[in-house]
Amino acid sequence: MSGRSVRAETRSRAKDDIKRVMAAIEKVRKWEKKWVTVGDTSLRIYKWVPVTEPKVDDKNKNKKKGKDEKCGSEVTTPENSSSPGMMDMHDDNSNQSSIADASPIKQENSSNSSPAPEPNSAVPSDGTEAKVDEAQADGKEHPGAEDASDEQNSQSSMEHSMNSSEKVDRQPSGDSGLAAETSAISQDLEGVPPSKKMKLEASQQNSEEM
């Protein structure tokens, strides 16, 4: 209970303080600064003077002040509303700037995306290079086979040439042998009777035909 009573006292004190402040504000509202002449002299002083107008005028003034305050608040509210509008404009500008900032980012992304296919295109090129290398390696291997085949062909051609040369050598040797045989036979025929010469010539012709 003590806590509640303390709270009630503080509330009542606060209310009293608020009332005093409001009364002081009302008194101040009843005062205003004016140029006032001092006594019978011509001196004029600008100081706070209580309002000397009747209460009706005070009420009207208070109403006018309230209206002015409302108008001022309304004027301030458009300013506030305009300030949010300006904030919106700033937001739009910031959005535009962010979009402008994002557009270079997009351009960078597009530029990054465009180099990205280049590695991909480079990969096929690497593949083609690998294929070319493989083809070259195969070509290197195949040329070995081709060299072997060329060697075989050359060997076969050499063999053919050797065989042909041997045949050629054999033919002249055969011809020379035949010539020697014919010469020997002719020499033999010189000391042989004509009947035997005919037989030998016939045998030579048969051997030549064979």
Swiss-Prot record:
Q: Which domain of life is it from?
A: Eukaryota
InterPro entries recorded for this chain?
A: BCL7
Keywords on this record?
Chromosomal rearrangement, Isopeptide bond, Phosphoprotein, Ubl conjugation
Its cellular-component GO annotations read:
chromatin; GBAF complex; nucleoplasm; SWI/SNF complex
Modified residues annotated as Phosphoserine in this record: 203, 207
The Basic and acidic residues compositionally biased stretches are 54-72, 128-145
Give an example GO biological process.
Answer: regulation of transcription by RNA polymerase II
Low complexity: bias regions: 108-125, 151-165
Record field: compositional bias (Polar residues): 74-84
Query: Which family, according to UniProt?
Result: Belongs to the BCL7 family.
Q: Which disease is it linked to?
A: Chromosomal aberrations involving BCL7A may be a cause of B-cell non-Hodgkin lymphoma. Three-way translocation t(8;14;12)(q24.1;q32.3;q24.1) with MYC and with immunoglobulin gene regions.
Q: What is this protein called?
A: B-cell CLL/lymphoma 7 protein family member A
Instruction: Look up and give the organism this protein is from.
Output: Homo sapiens
